[in-house]
């Protein structure tokens, strides 16, 4: 049976400032930690990325032409405050006013994120969100943006608090490149959630007309053997690290006893302690019912088995299938069942995980209000022929995920939109330019855009709401 989506459903495309804009030092923009980190550690940089800084009118015209009625955009904090606070960069402010005006002109609703992996270097080198001073700087930055950009109707505080902590302090593929420090992972998550809560409360107290929420990456975790209590425990602990800790902070305003038992076990095995203060929980409690929406970024699920050896994580950055490894002492090891397909980057394709995660939020956090799927898509080594890409694999991937959204809505979940990652091809943090996700192919040499087969398919779905 052909499935459908609601008439008012948003069919969006997602971008991020650092991955799309280029112009990393243009018009007064301050440095971010990624600038030097990429130069020192990788074979690529974020120059010029997709040159969105100059070519956004082209991308928004394409969005309008192809039925994309929402766009995720992030503001580069260091374009507004080059050092993270203090002096405002007028040219950066002007750029975003112009960008948002173009969105509205093209009838593409901007969903605007304040922080998408790109803390200004001056604050990042001072501890990033492990340093509580930077909570204050973030709230001040948020307050400035809320007041300066009344044309924005949908705000997101952070994109993927979980992967920021993981990338910086667990996997070590984000600056500062620290590995296996789980105390820092949890502390980063916590301090960013406090920052989120304070920004949300401020937004509501000021009476702004728009909506505000947060975007969490929520990869669903399953036990490899559901009959084996040790595998079940491994999946629960892995879920606490990546999902439950931040969801509790968002919607409970505290960490449940079950969550803290898991956190304490992980820290007992791996070392470290947390600084959780009374005023933090006052802030979390005050904001728990103020979130207008939850953004869920979903790409994959993981299966866990019990594991007691030493921690080792190997990141597959070049698309060499089977080269990744993930095992955490006292938590578990990721082992995918044979029956689930995976991408060249070892990302497991499992749409059921998106359905299960949505229904989990609905059940465990009934104060969630509504959900947008703020990122979902397939990273591919696209083959450019005949001025297009015949990306049937991407179409199939998105179709399967839209179908489970239709199921979730039918089963009572309030899901209001879907943003494909990504609108056009962009630069990928730890994979460079080989891994493409866009509806529109970008020739990074010429910066020309070409609609892929998926763009034509997505347009039809957006126009008819029929998933075919």
From Swiss-Prot:
Keywords: Glycosidase, Hydrolase
Presence of keyword Cell division: no
Enzymatic class: hydrolase
Catalytic center residues: 160 (proton donor), 375 (nucleophile)
Reactions catalysed, as given in the entry: a 6-phospho-beta-D-galactoside + H2O = D-galactose 6-phosphate + an alcohol
InterPro entries recorded: 6P-beta-galactosidase, Glyco_hydro_1, Glyco_hydro_1_AS, Glyco_hydro_1_N_CS, Glycoside_hydrolase_SF
Entry GO MF terms: 6-phospho-beta-galactosidase activity; beta-glucosidase activity
A GO cellular-component term linked to this record: cytosol
GO process annotations (BP): lactose catabolic process via tagatose-6-phosphate
Involved pathway(s): Carbohydrate metabolism; lactose degradation; D-galactose 6-phosphate and beta-D-glucose from lactose 6-phosphate: step 1/1
Pfam short name (any one): Glyco_hydro_1
Positions annotated to bind D-galactose 6-phosphate: 19, 116, 159-160, 297, 428-429, 435, 437
Family: Belongs to the glycosyl hydrolase 1 family.
Full protein name: 6-phospho-beta-galactosidase 2
Gene: lacG2
């Amino acid at each position: 049976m052909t499935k459908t989506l609601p008439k008012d459903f948003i069919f969006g495309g997602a971008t991020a400032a650092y991955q799309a804009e280029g112009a990393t030092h243009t018009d007064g923009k301050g440095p971010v930690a990624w600038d030097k980190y990429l130069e020192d550690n990788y074979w690529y940089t974020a120059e010029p990325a997709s040159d969105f800084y100059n070519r956004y009118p082209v991308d928004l015209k394409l969005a309008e032409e192809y039925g994309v009625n929402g766009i995720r955009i992030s503001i580069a904090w260091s374009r507004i405050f080059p050092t993270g606070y203090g002096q405002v960069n007028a040219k950066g402010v002007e750029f975003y006013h112009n960008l948002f005006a173009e969105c509205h002109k093209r009838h593409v609703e901007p969903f605007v994120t304040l922080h998408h992996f790109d803390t200004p270097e001056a604050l990042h080198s001072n501890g990033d969100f492990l340093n509580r001073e930077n909570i204050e700087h973030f709230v001040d930055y948020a307050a400035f943006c809320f007041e300066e950009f009344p044309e924005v109707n949908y705000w997101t505080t952070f994109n993927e608090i979980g992967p920021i902590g993981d990338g910086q302090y667990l996997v070590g593929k984000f600056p500062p490149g620290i590995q296996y420090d789980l105390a820092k992972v949890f502390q980063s998550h916590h301090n960013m959630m406090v920052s989120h809560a304070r920004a949300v409360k401020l937004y509501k107290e000021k009476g702004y007309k728009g909506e505000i929420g947060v975007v969490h990456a929520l990869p669903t975790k399953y036990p490899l053997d559901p009959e084996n209590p040790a595998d079940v425990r491994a999946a629960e602990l892995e879920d606490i690290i990546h999902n439950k800790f931040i969801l509790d902070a968002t919607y409970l305003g505290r960490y449940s006893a079950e969550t803290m038992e898991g956190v304490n076990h992980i820290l007992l095995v791996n070392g470290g302690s947390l600084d959780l203060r009374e005023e933090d929980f006052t802030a979390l409690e005050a904001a728990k019912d103020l979130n207008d929406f939850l953004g869920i970024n979903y790409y994959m699920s993981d299966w866990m088995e019990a594991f007691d050896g030493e921690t080792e994580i190997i990141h597959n950055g070049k698309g060499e299938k089977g080269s990744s490894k993930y095992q955490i002492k006292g938590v578990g090891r990721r082992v995918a069942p044979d029956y689930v397909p995976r991408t060249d980057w070892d990302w497991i394709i499992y749409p059921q995980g998106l359905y299960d995660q949505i229904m989990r939020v609905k059940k465990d956090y009934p104060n969630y209000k509504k959900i947008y799927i703020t990122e979902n898509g397939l990273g591919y080594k696209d083959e450019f022929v005949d001025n297009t890409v015949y990306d049937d694999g991407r179409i199939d991937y998105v179709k399967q995920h839209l179908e489970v959204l239709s199921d979730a809505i039918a089963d009572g979940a309030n899901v209001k939109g879907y943003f494909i990652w990504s609108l056009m091809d962009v630069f990928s943090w730890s994979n460079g330019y080989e891994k493409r996700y866009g509806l529109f192919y970008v020739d990074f040499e010429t910066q020309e855009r070409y609609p892929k087969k998926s763009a034509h398919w997505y347009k039809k779905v957006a126009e008819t709401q029929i998933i075919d």
